[in-house]
Each structure stands twice: as C-alpha cells, then as structure tokens.
Amino acid sequence: MIKNLPQIVLLNIVGLALFLSWYIPVNHGFWLPIDADIFYFFNQKLVESKAFLWLVALTNNRAFDGCSLLAMGMLMLSFWLKENAPGRRRIVIIGLVMLLTAVVLNQLGQALIPVKRASPTLTFTDINRVSELLSVPTKDASRDSFPGDHGMMLLIFSAFMWRYFGKVAGLIALIIFVVFAFPRVMIGAHWFTDIIVGSMTVILIGLPWVLLTPLSDRLITFFDKSLPGKNKHFQNK
C-alpha cells in the first residue's frame, strides 16, 4: 500500500478536473476570456512603453533561458557547498533524477494530451509582435504552445527543491518559476493557460507518483550505487 495514495489520487483528480474545465467547454469556456484579457493587456503595453518592450524582448531571448539554468544551478549550489563529499554526490544525483523526471513527464505530456494550438500571436490578428517592433532575436510565437514545457520544467524543479531541500528552497524555486516562465506569456509566445492549465495538469497528475512515492528515493539510491566515483553510502531523507 502506497503511504501517500490518498494525497496522490486527490492531486490527480484536481489535475484532471483542471484540464477538463479547459478542454471540454466550447472555445475553452471561461478560460478564453482570461487568456485574451491577459494577452491584450501585455500586448498593448508593447507600444505604450519602450522600456517594457525591451524588457519583454530581452527576457524572451535565448540567453535569458541560460539565466534560468544559472538561477536553478546557483540555488542547488548553495546547498552543495555546505555538504561533505557524500552529501555533494547526493545533490548531484538529485539533480540527475530531477532532469530525468522532467524529460519523461514533458514527453508524456506532449504525447498524451490531445491538444495542439498556436500561441496567441499566431491566433489573433492586428496585434503587436516584438519581432516586428525590434530587431532583437526573441521568441514571440509558437505553433504548438500547449502545454508550456518551459513552465513545466521550472515547476518540476520547484517541487524537487521543496521535497529534498525544504520549504524555503521550494519558495525560492517558485520565484524563479514566475520570473522565468511568465515572460513567455507577456510576449505572447504562450497563453496563460499553457502554464496554469497545461503545465499544471502534467505536474498534478505525473509528479506525485515520483515525489510522493518511494520512486524518487529509489532512483537516487540506484544512481548512487551505479555511477562511478562513490566513496560512501548515504541515506535518503
């Protein structure tokens, strides 16, 4: 019997209900006005403020994606520096299991969710596009934006940090999620619901089976025993 089965099932039900609330209604029901209002709010700001235009352009440049990796790495490094050799090895392996989980859940989400939709910049007409307002390399459109893979990866990182490093680390990771995921919404490369519905659906249905069961701990133990360079065994928390 899985110890946290009631919580896992509850989270799965919430995730499924969230997705169906968006998927079943014609034109996505109450979600579409929310999506449209958020898109047009930020889209109008692009021509009202040059500073905002540049902010959105720069935060959707590929280099900014590298900054998100740096932020995640620095947070994990802050814990790594405090550990001895076995503890440091453990943190590296947690990162490996986190990456493996992110890849698997992202692929499953893309394959199993029966949705393909273009970003709002490719859906609405008579709108402002950063790529047309500035000659700066930036991502302002996507032919298939659902679910939001970038947001999904950052949410998985947040959950792992919470699970293995505590609430404070989890909250800092959530701040990183907001800072690096929502510029995609501001520029129009993603709908708000790509993240709030799409990414969250995959997280609520898939991730509990990794973090609320012994699976993640067993994977960490497996890699600790299998990978070279091991000096001491460690115990999972």
Swiss-Prot record:
GO terms for molecular function: phosphotransferase activity, phosphate group as acceptor; undecaprenyl-diphosphatase activity. Residues 27-62, 112-145, 189-194 are periplasmic. The chain crosses the membrane at residues 6-26, 63-83, 91-111, 168-188, 195-215. GO terms for cellular component: plasma membrane. SMART domains: acidPPc. It holds the Pfam family PAP2. Involved in the modification of the lipid A domain of lipopolysaccharides (LPS). Transfers a phosphate group from undecaprenyl pyrophosphate (C55-PP) to lipid A to form lipid A 1-diphosphate. Contributes to the recycling of undecaprenyl phosphate (C55-P). In vitro, has low undecaprenyl-diphosphate phosphatase activity. This is Lipid A 1-diphosphate synthase. It comes from Escherichia coli (strain K12). The gene is lpxT.
